[in-house]
């Protein structure tokens, strides 16, 4: 749910805030455009205004309850990621995780998110858009039949022992098996390509609407283990495999730094 004008998803209905009585649900009663108000006031003060968006989560659960499109719309619920847990492959909706991520591999998910970004770009005085959580949920994501088929298409062969030939259930980042599973490096490469290609398309679509708006991302600086969320935020000139044993020879091709302002 959002605080800007769009027909793609619903407006925020409540937010949590710490008050004198503790963490409290604050119902939204205002009908004015929150983002436009920030733009207007920011410009009066000579400030630049950037809009941040939680990219791939479709809902969130807190002590105040569950909110988000995946809790209201069964079609969108079906887009959520499936995790390679130690107890089998499970929907993120069925495990104890607060943020309910979509599967970034899905074409319908990508179009859904980009449509929202296009609406953000229509704010003519907005200085920039920053994507947070523009990534996979984590190392366990995504092991749906949809993603398996896309991966098999990418490598040109069937994965016979799934998911063990990719990542054995329960594998932790930084505690990789030796030797690495048959398709492990290509899997990391595939995921990095998924996020890279999303960013390239999203930037192009945003710039087509507003060429002046800046496009950027918020990422973690721990590059050596950031493969767990499928993100290569480096320059493609940095040959990842020369430094890290988990990277394929092509992993560096999907560094998306040149596509950020």
Locations of regions flagged by a protein language model:
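Catalytic domains of carbohydrate-active enzymes, especially glycoside hydrolases
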Residues: 1-2, 123-127, 260-261
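Aromatic- and acidic-residue-enriched segments that line the glycan-binding/catalytic groove
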Residues: 2-17, 57-95, 133-174, 228-242
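Aromatic-lined substrate-binding rim segments of carbohydrate-active enzymes
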Residues: 2-57, 186, 190-209
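Active-site-adjacent "subsite" loops/lids of carbohydrate-active enzymes
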Residues: 28, 32-40, 50-124, 173-185
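Hydrophobic faces of well-ordered beta-strands that scaffold small-molecule active sites
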Residues: 49-51, 129-132, 215-217, 261
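Substrate-binding cleft/loops of secretory-pathway carbohydrate-active enzymes
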Residues: 58-66, 139, 199, 208-261
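Active-site neighborhood of glycoside hydrolase catalytic domains
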Residues: 115, 123, 128-131, 137, ...
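Active-site phosphate/pyrophosphate- and oxyanion-stabilizing loops and adjacent acidic/basic residues
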Residues: 118, 204, 254
């Amino acid at each position: 749910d959002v605080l800007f004008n769009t027909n793609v998803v619903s407006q925020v209905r409540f937010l949590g805030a710490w008050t004198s009585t503790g963490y409290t649900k604050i119902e939204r009663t205002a009908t004015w455009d929150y983002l436009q108000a920030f733009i207007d006031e920011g410009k009066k003060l000579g400030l630049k205004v950037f809009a941040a968006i939680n990219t791939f989560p479709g809902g969130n659960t807190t002590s105040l309850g569950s909110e988000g499109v995946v809790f209201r719309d069964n079609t969108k619920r079906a887009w959520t990621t499936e995790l390679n847990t130690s107890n089998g492959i499970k929907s993120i909706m069925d495990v104890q995780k607060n943020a309910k991520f979509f599967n970034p591999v899905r074409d319908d998910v990508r179009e859904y998110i980009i449509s929202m970004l296009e609406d953000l770009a229509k704010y003519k005085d907005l200085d920039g858009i920053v994507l947070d959580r523009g990534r996979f949920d984590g190392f366990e994501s995504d092991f749906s039949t949809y993603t398996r088929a896309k991966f098999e298409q990418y490598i040109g062969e069937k994965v016979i022992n799934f998911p063990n030939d990719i990542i054995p259930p329960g594998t932790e980042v930084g505690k990789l098996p030796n030797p690495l599973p048959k398709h492990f490096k290509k899997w990391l490469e595939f995921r990095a390509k998924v996020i890279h290609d999303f960013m390239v398309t999203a930037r192009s679509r945003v710039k087509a609407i507003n060429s002046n708006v800046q496009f950027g991302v918020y990422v973690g600086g721990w590059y050596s283990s950031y493969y767990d969320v499928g993100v290569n935020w480096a320059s493609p000139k940095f040959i990842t495999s020369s430094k890290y044993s988990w990277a394929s020879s092509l992993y560096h091709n999907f560094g998306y730094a040149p596509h950020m302002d």
